[in-house]
A protein has these predicted regions:
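Conserved pre-ATP/AMP-binding loop-to-beta segment of ANL
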Residues: 145-164, 170-171, 198-207
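Gly/Ser/Thr-rich phosphate-binding loop
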Residues: 228, 254-257, 268-332, 345
Length: 500
């Protein structure tokens, strides 16, 4: 991306202020409204002396006004500190108090939640809305209090966003992501999925559907990518099949993005193929995509499903498929997340001594972006001789059962192969005798029946004895993170509650 992110966003906002920008709940917000909110946020931060890379908390709901606030902080050169609105009041207030930001922005409804103004701790409080367009001070928080507040990021490489990880294996962590990281990731995605190179600054005719939470990397990145490319967005509060199908049917996009669990939900809902007549490609990331789900979706809807691999630490995508790769390699490389994107390098190293592994050998995945150094991930994988990356699990979720190492991913893959199983999750629980034991929870497909005993018997035929879960339960819905990954802390809580 040759143009700095903030300059690019400012240029897009000024192209045609009256043109539609974001559809939300069947109503369009124009670029002028986004620019007005963004400009007012920028002005108010500067007015109270927060002009040097301010850290600004955003209770980041999927809402056009919060997109405007997000743009305002970035235009001011600040750091967006993401705060998850899906927490209960106690958790939300603890999160707000913990980040100690000098400014906090939210929708009016979130400011009305119990004790949120108190948790802000004297920060400048701003509430934003679109009906009418507004950016107002919160009563009692109209000026900067004494703090103490966190210091601004003064890194040589300015920080754009402190992003929450998905919290799949433990409590979410905050990852600082620089403006440069977003610029590189947007450029890499544009080059990988488009044949026309870096897009010019202009408004486009298509509509991109964003159904992932803005508080998660997938939703935030897709929003910034599409705005920087001048593309309209249809924004969902959360993914629901009927609302998603309505948007696809009305806007006829060529490409859509669905996480693996959303692909399965569309299949389960028996959505007719006609709904996807305009769609050529479906990108899918954030979690492993079972090959059987990919094959079933492609067969039913006649689309190319393009798995991808990314991480919060890299501000989005690292590797992926595109349509050209799919046409040539899809049948031979099932299970792969594609090849590294432009400006990304991937290598596999030994978990024990860090030496680089040969093609086809499993190890820890390391990534290097343009101008950077090698960064170790917690993911296990391998790269074949043709440069395709395969993800095999994580290095930090192994269960040690009496000295035997058990991968939750192996249990989940086996359970997903049962015809009655829609999805599954596995984690480890403490055990006095063995140290840890694996347990599993299963969500059944619509109309299917299977008992825990039947599923355990199914696993005994497919796994080693020490891999078979000590306990298995069937649940109506698996606990999930905001990005719809199965949550291991949530699984542990299920079993702890059942035991109590």
């Amino acid at each position: 991306m040759s143009q700095p992110l903030a300059a690019r966003l400012r240029a897009v906002l000024a192209l045609d202020p009256a043109a539609p920008a974001i559809e939300y709940r069947d109503s369009w917000t124009d670029w002028q409204t986004l620019a007005t909110i963004a400009g007012e946020v920028e002005k108010r931060l500067t007015a109270v002396g927060l002009s040097q890379r301010p850290a600004v908390g955003l209770i980041l709901r999927n809402h056009p006004a919060m997109v405007g606030a997000l743009l305002g902080v970035l235009l001011a050169g600040g750091c967006v500190v993401t705060i998850n609105p899906s927490h209960g009041d106690t958790g939300l207030n603890a999160d707000i108090a913990g980040v100690r930001v000098p400014a906090l922005i939210a929708l009016p409804a979130d400011w009305r939640r119990l004790d949120v103004p108190l948790a802000a701790g004297g920060a400048l409080g701003l509430q934003v809305d679109i009906n009418p367009t507004a950016c107002r001070s919160v009563s009692g928080l109209d000026r900067l209090g004494p703090g103490p507040f966190r210091a601004a990021h003064l890194d040589p490489d300015p920080i754009a966003v402190e992003m929450l990880t998905s919290g799949t294996t433990g409590p979410p962590k905050r990852i600082p992501l620089s403006y440069r990281s977003f610029e590189h990731t947007i450029a890499a995605a544009s080059a990988h999925y488009s044949s026309s190179g870096e897009p010019q600054v202009r408004l486009r005719s298509g509509v991109a559907i964003v159904s992932s939470p803005l508080v998660h990397m997938s939703g935030l990145f897709r929003t910034l990518l599409n705005i920087s490319e001048g593309r309209k967005i249809a924004l969902l509060e959360r993914f629901r099949v009927p609302e998603f199908v309505d948007l696809v049917t009305r806007h006829r996009p060529r490409a859509v993005s669905l996480v693996p669990s959303a692909l399965a939900m569309v299949l389960d809902a028996d959505v007719p193929p006609e709904a996807f007549l305009s769609v050529e490609v479906v990108t899918s990331g954030t979690a492993p995509l079972p090959a059987e789900v990919q094959i079933a979706f492609e067969k039913r809807y006649g689309v190319a499903v393009l798995p991808s691999y990314g991480a919060t630490e890299f501000a989005g995508g690292v590797a992926g498929w595109n349509l050209a790769l799919h046409r040539e390699w899809a049948e031979r490389k099932r299970g792969s997340v594609g090849r590294p994107q432009k400006g990304r390098e991937v290598r596999i190293v030994s978990v024990t001594d860090g030496t680089e592994m040969a093609a086809g050998q499993q190890g820890r995945i390391e990534v290097r972006t343009t101008g950077g150094h090698w960064v170790a991930t917690t993911d296990l994988g391998r790269i074949d001789r043709d440069g395709f990356l395969f993800i095999d699990g994580r290095t930090d979720d192994a269960i040690i059962r009496g000295g035997f190492k058990v991968s939750p991913n192996d249990i989940v893959k086996a359970l997903r192969s049962h015809p009655a199983v829609r999805d599954a999750g596995s984690t480890g629980l403490p055990d006095e005798r063995l140290g840890q034991v694996p347990v599993a929870a299963v969500e059944l497909a619509s109309g299917a029946t299977a008992t825990p005993d039947q599923l355990l018997e199914f696993l005994r035929d497919r796994l080693s004895r020490y891999q078979v879960p000590a306990r298995l339960i069937v649940v109506d819905e698996l606990p999930r993170t905001p990005s719809l990954k199965v949550s291991q802390p949530g699984l542990r809580k299920l079993f702890e509650e059942a035991q109590a």
